[in-house]
A protein has these predicted regions:
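Fe(II)/2-oxoglutarate oxygenase catalytic core
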Residues: 1-83, 89-117
C-alpha cells in the first residue's frame, strides 16, 4: 500500500526500477553514494521512507545530501513515517547512529531512473 501511494504521488505512476531496505544500528557505517548514474540527473528520483515507530532526535541517523561541490545541501531527521524524496543522482548518506540508541534505523527506498512526473 505504501509503495503504491509513493509511486502515484511522487513518481507519476512510473514503475519503480529499484526497491530496497536498509537497516542500521550503532556501529554501522554508511558511505556517501548516488543511487543512479549522473546521466539520469534530469529524470531520476529516489524516495526514502522511515517506517520506524519511535525515533529520538539525539539518536542520529540523519539523512544528508551533498551539493555538487561537496557541501551539505540538505539534512532530514529520522521521524516515524517520514518520506524524503530527492533526485536519485544526488550524493547522499545516512549519518551514524548514537551509542545511546538501542533501536534499529529502518529505511525503505523506492527508485526510478526515468520519472516523467
Amino acid at each position: 500500500e505504501v509503495a503504491e501511494i509513493v509511486r502515484q504521488k511522487h513518481f507519476g505512476g512510473e514503475a519503480f526500477t529499484r526497491v530496497w531496505a536498509n537497516f542500521q544500528s550503532f556501529g554501522d557505517e554508511s558511505a556517501f553514494h548516488r543511487d543512479f548514474p549522473v546521466k539520469y540527473a534530469q529524470s531520476a528520483r529516489t524516495a526514502v521512507w522511515y517506517p520506524v515507530m519511535n525515533w529520538e532526535r539525539d539518536w542520529g541517523g540523519d539523512f544528508i545530501t551533498l551539493s555538487e561541490d561537496g557541501e551539505v545541501d540538505a539534512c532530514a531527521l529520522v521521524k516515524p513515517n517520514r518520506l524524503v524524496v530527492f533526485n536519485g543522482t544526488q550524493t547522499h548518506a545516512a549519518r551514524p547512529i548514537s551509542r545511546y540508541c538501542s533501536e534499529l534505523r529502518i529505511a525503505v527506498s523506492f527508485g526510478c531512473e526515468v520519472v516523467n512526473a
